[in-house]
Curated annotation (Swiss-Prot):
Primary location group: membrane
Disulfide bridge partners, by residue number: none
Pfam families named in the record: DUF445 (PF04286)
Membrane topology term: Multi-pass membrane protein
Family as reported in the entry's similarity comment: Belongs to the UPF0754 family.
GO CC field: plasma membrane
Protein name: UPF0754 membrane protein Sca_1420
UniProt keywords, alphabetically: Cell membrane, Membrane, Transmembrane, Transmembrane helix
Highest taxon in the source lineage: Bacteria
Length: 376
């Protein structure tokens, strides 16, 4: 009986020593949180392991996460996976459908950035037109018009000029043959007689004004059909046309005239462009073909582009993000009590097993000591 009590006592003492030692060891991982000194001598094991090595632990954890857990190759693999592609493509498709349903406009997108798209676009377009016109005038104002006219347009103008003589003569004949033409000739003849007085009155002794007007009308009509008259008209028109083509742009349009033209031309272009109406028009109505194409191809194309560009620039992105640095900084910012709670929550079961193992090993060692003590 005495031997049994001795062994039991040694088991209890050993278990208590082993268990309490492990409990203290676990506590010493986190406590004390600062160093204690006796004079200049620092008490051993202060601060605890975690407070003392927190920066080193944070650095190591950050490196482990970046080099072994969230690696560049792993992220590339996940981004390129079928599930990731399907998720991205599904999201893009949903957004396109949402744009159609919500009647989204270009101004809606610009509004997210605080931009008045209509005013901005009009200002940009107005400045661009003014700059281009001014630059064109400055570069070409000494050049002849014929060098500035496109060859196709020049050919067409030449054809129009050639057709101008018959047209003018035919119109003149029609006018002279009309009642208005006849009346205008009579009125001019009446004015002419009134100005010339008695000398012209002698003609009226042989012919009446009506006869004279009729003869003049007939001669003018005959003149419009005469080949020589038409040749003279054609030559005059062609001479003026060639003179105009050989003039410089600056000789035809002065700087003041150009500025006046520009001031009227730019607002005219802007009014035809009607930018305000276009940027506030639903995109599905503004560019239905683009929306249709986007529905059919944009999701797949954009997904491929996102995956390719993400993989291409992932290395530089990860360097700029500095994942290990973020983890290290975050861990260093945690309160020590929070780190203790976090570790205990994660390893609670294992820590309890360690404490139980301490009691068990202590008990076994105590039992062995008790047995040895009986035989010594």
């Amino acid at each position: 009986m005495h031997a049994f009590l001795v062994i039991l006592f040694m088991i209890v003492i050993g278990a208590l020593i082993g268990g309490i030692t492990n409990i203290i060891a676990i506590k010493m991982l986190f406590h004390p949180q600062r160093a204690y000194h006796i004079g200049k001598w620092r008490i051993p094991f202060t601060p605890g392991l975690v407070p003392k090595r927190r920066e080193e632990i944070a650095y190591k954890i950050g490196n482990v996460i970046e080099e072994h857990l969230i690696t560049e190759s792993l992220i590339k693999e996940k981004i390129s996976s079928l599930s990731a592609r399907e998720a991205i493509e599904s999201f893009i498709t949903q957004q396109i459908q949402k744009l159609k349903k919500d009647n989204a406009t270009l101004q809606n997108f610009a509004g997210y950035f605080g931009i008045d798209l209509a005013k901005t676009a009009e200002d940009k377009l107005s400045n661009l037109i003014d700059e281009k016109l001014a630059q064109y005038y400055q570069d070409h104002n000494q050049e002849p018009l014929k060098s500035l006219i496109p060859s196709e347009l020049e050919v067409e103008l030449d054809e129009k000029i050639e057709a101008l003589t018959p047209l003018l003569c035919d119109r003149a004949r029609i006018y002279l043959s009309s009642a208005k033409g006849e009346q205008d000739i009579y009125n001019m003849l009446d004015t002419f007689f009134a100005e010339k007085g008695k000398i012209i009155g002698l003609l009226q002794m042989f012919m009446t004004k009506e006869n004279i007007a009729e003869r003049i009308q007939m001669e003018l009509i005959r003149l419009t059909n005469h080949p020589k008259a038409r040749e003279i008209v054609a030559q005059l028109i062609n001479n003026e046309y060639m003179t105009l083509k050989n003039k410089s742009l600056g000789g035809v349009v002065s700087p003041e005239q150009f500025n006046n033209i520009k001031e009227k031309f730019t607002p005219l272009i802007l009014s035809y462009a009607d930018i305000s109406a276009r940027v506030n028009q639903p995109i599905k109505d503004l560019a239905p073909s683009i929306v249709k194409y986007a529905e059919q191809h944009a999701a797949t194309w954009t997904t491929n582009l996102i995956v390719e560009k993400a993989a291409e620039h992932l290395s530089s992105i990860m360097k700029q993000v500095n994942l290990s640095g973020i983890v290290e900084e975050q861990i260093n910012s945690f309160d020590l009590d929070y780190i203790e709670r976090l570790i205990i929550e994660i390893a609670n079961k294992e820590l309890k097993l360690i404490m139980l193992l301490g009691f068990l090993l202590g008990g076994i060692i105590g039992c062995l000591q008790g047995i040895i003590a009986l035989f010594v």
